[in-house]
Amino acid sequence: MVSVLFVCLGNICRSPTAEGVFRHLVETEGLAGDIRTDSAGTGSWHIGQPPDGRAQGAARKRGIDIGDLRARQAKAYDFERFDYVLAMDSSNYRDLASMCPRDRRDRLHMFLDFAPEVGKRDVPDPYYEGGFDAVFDMVETASRGLLADIRHRHGL
C-alpha cells in the first residue's frame, strides 16, 4: 500500500483540503485499497480540531466532505510511515526537512511539484487572506499529477 501525508502549517486549511481531494480522487479511481492518506501540520495550535469551516465549505461545494478530519502535528516518525510527505509551501518544507532522517529525504516533496502547470511552488495559505476556491483548484491539479506519479512508480 502506498501512503501519502499532506502537510501545511496548522492542518486546518490546505493539508486537510489536499487529503480530502486526493482521497476522493483515489476512491473515484477505484484505488482506495491501494493508497492511504493522512494530513498534518508543522505547528501544534490546532491539534484535535476539524478543518476550518471555509475549507469545509469549499470542499462541500465540490461534493467532498472533509469534516471527519482532525488536525495533528507532523513528527519525524511520519517519514517512516509515509512514502510521500508533501509540503504545501517552502516554509513547511524547511520545517519538515529539519526533522527528516537523511535516509528518507526522497520521501519529502513540494506538493505543487506534481502540478508544474500551476506555475507556483507554494500553495498559498488562505487562513488570513481567503482564496479557498483558488487553493482548491491548485490542490485538484496537483492531486491528479500526484496520482499519475504514484501509478507510474508503483504500477497501480
Descriptions of predicted regions:
Residues C8, A59, L86-A87, V139:
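Hydrophobic structural packing positions in well-ordered secondary structure
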Residues Y84, S90-L156:
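Phosphate-binding/catalytic loops
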Residues M1-R81, A148-L156:
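Conserved active-site segments centered on acidic
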Residues S15, D89-S90:
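Helix N-cap/beta->alpha junction signal
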